[in-house]
From Swiss-Prot:
Gene Ontology biological-process entries: defense response
Sequence position, cross-link Cyclopeptide (Gly-Asn): 1-31
Keyword terms, alphabetized: Disulfide bond, Knottin, Plant defense
Tissues showing expression: Expressed in seed but not in root, nodule, flower, stem, shoot, leaf and pod (at protein level).
Heme in keyword set: no
Family: Belongs to the cyclotide family. Bracelet subfamily.
Cystines in this chain: 4-21, 8-23, 13-28
Protein name per Swiss-Prot or TrEMBL: Cliotide T11
Mod. after translation: Contains 3 disulfide bonds. This is a cyclic peptide.
Notes on the domains: The presence of a 'disulfide through disulfide knot' structurally defines this protein as a knottin.
Function summary: Probably participates in a plant defense mechanism.
Taxonomic superkingdom: Eukaryota
């Protein structure tokens, strides 16, 4: 539930995905 500062509208989460973030509502979130 914490925004990671990366969007995933056109491409999936990349750098933040390494930190455990996942795509939700076009934004990368962690918990």
């Amino acid at each position: 539930g914490i925004p990671c500062g990366e969007s995933c509208v056109f491409i999936p989460c990349t750098i933040t995905a390494l930190l455990g973030c996942s795509c939700k509502d076009k934004v990368c979130y962690k918990n």
